[in-house]
Amino acid sequence: MEAGIVSYGAYVPRYRITPTEIGRVWGVDGEAMGLGLNVRRKSVPAPDEDTITISTEALRTALVRGAIDPQQIGALYVGSESHPYAVKPTATVVAQAVGATPNLTAADFEFACKAGTAAIQTCLGLVGAGMVTYGVAIGTDTSQGAPGDALEYSASAGGAAFVIGKDRVICRVNRTVSYTTDTPDFWRREGQKYPSHGGRFTGEPAYFRHVTECAHRIMEAVGTTPKDYRHVVFHQPNGKFPQRVGKQLGFTEPQMRYGLVTPSIGNTYSAAALIGLANVLDHAGPGEKILVVGYGSGAGSDAFDLETTDAIDSYEKVYGRPVEYYLEKGVEISYAVYAKFRGKINMGGS
């Protein structure tokens, strides 16, 4: 495959809340909940942050790092399940904000937490076919769980943007494979504020089945085994699931080290695997093989066999903040501030 990753950027809001603080309000042992999920804290967007602003921040970093002219972007897709508008695309606002309009195609993608990886696949096809010079794929979410629900301990916010092209490729995409079924593990109807989920049903028949099947199929397709990869990144609805699936597939903790980011920032949904990949690329040198397996409820997985090139040595990683900054920093807030920021307090009226 000629097309690959030319540049990337990530952004995570600065505010954080811990499972302990959430549990304190609901009379639950939040510390035990956090340990069970392997989530120490999660990111919280400020009142003036949403999928549009987060996507724009991530993409601006990617464009400057790669010295890419926004007018050369021929396609821009934003994958999310928390688009600000039901009718009005996120992608057009982001494209306008970075100066990429008007000569491009743009659209919003939805497929739960794998909308971002689906956007990457689409960009790979367009670039590979010679229809566009650069394609931009963004995965961003400002996810929410109902007050007191188990999701509230992990659902967070963040985004990552990847520029796909043929020139100055820093990470080559060797193969991509998908595995998709109709599995109703997680859903939210139009007009419903918070999502519903199948509890334990979200595990074995949903996440684990799709991720393991997709991982096996891509390794079979390219003739690799777990030991051939320097890094592996899985979708991470919490910190526990990716560790478990990695062990089942035969990967080691060192291979998962940089790709596992949820324990520090929570589940960023469409951005989860992509922020993990961005962190891997922050630390990677030339010739390192990477396996990425995303997952989206409903349900499906997209897997990518990647390998960094010599160009990553000269790639301008210093612009913008590395993912590690977001994993280590943050301003902790109380549940009261969190509820205010996320609109969880119903003030009445329209």
Describe each model-derived feature in a short phrase.
Residues 128-161:
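Flexible, glycine-rich active-site loops centered on histidine and acidic residues
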